[in-house]
Amino acid sequence: MPAATLTAKGRQTRAAIEQAARKLFAERGFHGTTLADITSAAGKSPAVFYRYFADKEDLLAFLAESFLHDVVTPSALRVQLPDAPDDDAFFTSVVTGYWNMFKQNIGIMIAVAQLAATQRRFAHLQNEFRRFGMDIVAASVRRAQEQGHGTDLHPQHTAAAIALLFENFTTVFVGTSGPEGLGLKISDTDAIATLSTVWKKTLYGT
């Protein structure tokens, strides 16, 4: 049911279901979360779920598409490319925004990744998220080349490599498995600094 047609109580109920799903997908993954888990966490009866969503996949698709179109895509419009090779603020600012945005929605990203391997609908969504990062990195490569740096880099290839590195790094270090299994401990600040440095050095070598 479209949110615009809901009553205030209906919007509140739907929001509770969505929030419960985000939390449980982050903790248990898509396959480890049942509809009963979601409605129980939302404090609603299982029957209520079907007033708003056809099934669990429909709920995930809605959450992912909303995150993509309402949060991720608009954020790219605010990105200003680096003014100079020593513009550390650009890299730190963009990576901080990326890290915080995806950390808050890691459950959605994990669930989409789990379904993308077998379902075209979610594979398409996953690639839309990836294009967001790739477009920004590719633009930064071209800016560096305009400044006389990274002339041997292929903008799209480099963008894919860095964007996928960011994706996997974030999933491991923010996801429930965490870095502990690797014997590592890293703060948000250190994670952001690491990703920023890798990106900047790839373009400028310093």
Regions found by a protein language model. Give the residues of each.
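Helical hydrophobic small-molecule/effector-binding pocket
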Residues: 69-73, 88-113, 135-138, 163-174, ...
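Hydrophobic/aromatic-rich alpha-helical bundle segments in the mid-to-C-terminal region
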Residues: 123, 145-196, 206
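Helix-turn-helix
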Residues: 5, 16, 24-58, 62
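Hydrophobic alpha-helical connector segments
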Residues: 62, 76-104, 155-163, 189-192
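N-terminal intrinsically disordered/low-complexity leader segments
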Residues: 1-12, 152, 178-181
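Short secondary-structure transition hinges
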Residues: 104-136, 156, 183-185
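Generic hydrophobic, amphipathic alpha-helix propensity
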Residues: 10-22, 38, 63-71, 137
